From Swiss-Prot:
Cytoplasmic side stretches: 1-3, 510-515
Origin species: Mus musculus (Mouse)
Residues at the active site: 168
Name of the protein this chain belongs to: Membrane-bound transcription factor site-2 protease
UniProt-recorded Gene Ontology molecular function terms: metal ion binding; metalloendopeptidase activity; transcription regulator activator activity
Location of the protein in the cell: Membrane; Cytoplasm; Golgi apparatus membrane
EC code(s) of this entry: 3.4.24.85
PROSITE patterns the UniProt entry points to: ZINC_PROTEASE
Gene3D superfamilies registered for this protein in UniProt: 2.30.42.10
Highest classification ranks of the organism: Eukaryota, Metazoa, Chordata, Craniata, Vertebrata
Topology in membrane: Multi-pass membrane protein
Gene Ontology biological process terms, A to Z: bone maturation; cholesterol metabolic process; membrane protein intracellular domain proteolysis; mitotic G2 DNA damage checkpoint signaling; positive regulation of cholesterol biosynthetic process; positive regulation of transcription by RNA polymerase II; protein maturation; response to endoplasmic reticulum stress
Length: 515
């Protein structure tokens, strides 16, 4: 749910701005001077919308647009080809996204025949829904406070603004390259959404050829696509860029542990700890951490080898009983240090025993069965923690501290512990800086790429509308002599694109906010 405080700040702030604007424009004393000030500074204010336009960047735009004319010609030709391909590809992408959303809605809807499903079927559906997370959609609706953390709004809006500015710079340079008069550049704020725009002389735009128009209209999404590619390159090269100050490949560094995290405590994880293993799974970077947790979550609980003499020494008589999910519990004292283990004796009979977890699993090798523990003459058993269905016992190695024994769902560890692959070489360096840079670049890649895809959709009021019109003018004018037929074809394509985009946005919003 969207935080109430965020809504109050947004609505209250806009109300104050609009009322101040209304009062000043209604004032006998300040009306003319205030309106002159707005006009001189290129400002305009309306409900939930502030717009600023200036001509101070015109010289820079004209300089960019007239420099290396031949190279720019080839550059925007590439952009034109990309824009046309992106326009038609957007239909396929939106159609696929819509089908994925509908399939997800059907999967989330309770079946009338499943009201009395067993615990095993419940476990199966939970597992399948979790695995579907790996098949994420390319396009997703983002709502601040719901699927966009409030503490990452700065990254989001900064990336949106930069993507918008780069988009409009593309339009502006292409327009000047095609001899269209450039009036100015501006920035706007709509509710909480920042953006940019360029003001072009419409008459000049209508007089140039359809191919020239295509170069201008495709330039924005082309620049967004290139920006996303540069972001990917920067992300890949980030370890090299930060190499003089940070090193990687030896583990993951803990940057934050949430207050409600199960990993918090005297023998838990602390900021600055270096994690090298999860169970027997080596961790050298963030990707390893995520893959290890996935493996632990979706595979059966791993066991630990223990000698028969140690098992006899640590265990004590217990009475085992079944939990509601079918698993077995045998520790009746509600101890935070004891865990119920199961194992098979020499006669292959399954037994249960309650053991102090740390003494049982410390300095032992992992196993799947008794065969994995056959070493030397002493008899050993593979003891497996008997836990609830989705709960795991995870041994987290973070030397030089003693291993942390985590009992809980692996996803809780994933969501409540923040990590980074970058370890500072010097104590004065911040452990958060690489995370900040990495997070911002990821937002820039996602949002610039999304802006390129969405703007390419042949939809009313988007770049795709003008790309489509210019494309039809360039290709169908000589084939279809009747302009009305050509306009009708364009209208139905635009209508289809608009409906497809609206359906994706509507269902996407419903999926995000209703669940």
């Amino acid at each position: 749910m969207i935080p109430v405080s965020l809504l109050v700040v947004v609505v209250g702030g806009w109300t104050a701005v609009y009322l101040a604007d209304l009062v000043l424009k209604s004032s006998v004393y300040f009306k003319h001077s205030y309106e002159d000030w707005l006009e001189n500074n290129g400002l305009s204010i309306s409900p939930f919308h502030i717009r600023w336009q200036t001509s101070i960047f015109n010289r820079a735009f004209y300089s960019w647009g007239r420099r290396k004319a031949r190279m720019l010609y080839q550059w925007f030709n590439f952009g034109m080809v990309f824009g046309v391909i992106a326009m038609f590809s957007s239909f396929f992408l939106l159609g696929k996204t819509l089908m994925q959303t509908l399939a997800q809605m059907m999967a989330d809807s309770p079946s009338p025949y499943s009201s009395s499903s067993s615990s095993s079927s419940s476990s199966s559906s939970s597992s399948s829904s979790s695995s579907s997370l790996h098949n994420e959609q390319v396009l997703q609706v983002v709502v601040p406070g719901i699927n966009l953390p409030v503490n990452q709004l700065t990254y989001f809006f900064a990336a949106v603004l930069i993507s918008g500015v780069v988009h409009e710079i593309g339009h502006g340079i292409a327009a000047i390259r095609e001899q269209v008069r450039f009036n100015g550049f501006g920035i706007f704020l709509f509710i909480i959404y920042p953006g940019a725009f360029v003001d072009l002389f419409t008459t000049h735009l209508q007089l140039i050829s359809p191919v020239q128009q295509l170069r201008i209209f495709c330039a924005g999404i082309w620049h967004n696509f290139v920006l996303a590619l540069l972001g990917i390159l920067a992300l890949v090269l980030l370890p090299v860029i930060l190499l003089p100050f940070y090193y990687t490949g030896v583990g993951v560094l803990i940057t934050e542990v949430a207050e409600d995290s199960p990993a918090i405590g005297p023998r838990g994880l602390f900021v600055g700890d270096l994690v090298t293993h999860l169970q027997d799974c080596p961790v050298t970077n963030v990707q390893d951490w995520n893959e290890c947790l996935d493996t632990i979550a979706y595979e059966p609980q791993i066991g630990y080898c223990i000698s028969a003499s140690t098992l006899q020494q640590l265990s004590f008589p217990v009475r085992a009983y079944k939990r509601l999910d079918g698993s077995t519990e045998c520790c009746n004292n509600h101890s935070l240090t004891d865990v119920c283990f199961s194992y098979r004796n020499n006669f292959n009979k399954r037994l249960h025993t309650c053991l102090p977890a740390r003494k049982a699993v410390e300095a032992t090798q992992v196993c799947r069965s008794n065969k994995d523990c056959k070493s030397g003459a002493s008899s050993s058993f593979c003891i497996v923690p008997s836990l609830e269905t989705h709960t795991r016992l995870i041994k987290v190695k973070h030397p030089p501290q003693i291993d942390m024994l985590y009992v809980g769902h692996p996803l809780h560890l994933h969501y409540t512990v923040s990590i980074t692959s970058f370890i500072p070489r010097f104590n004065f360096l911040s452990i958060d800086l690489p995370v900040i840079v990495e997070t911002f670049v990821k937002y820039l890649i996602s949002l610039s790429g999304a802006l390129a895809i969405v703007n390419a959709v042949p939809c009313f009021a988007l770049d795709g509308q003008w790309i489509l019109n210019s494309f039809l003018d360039a290709t169908l004018t000589s084939v279809i002599g009747d302009n009305d037929v050509k306009d009708l074809i364009g209208f139905f394509i635009l209508l289809g694109g608009s409906v497809l985009l609206a359906a994706n946005v509507t269902l996407g919003l419903w999926m995000v906010t209703a669940r």
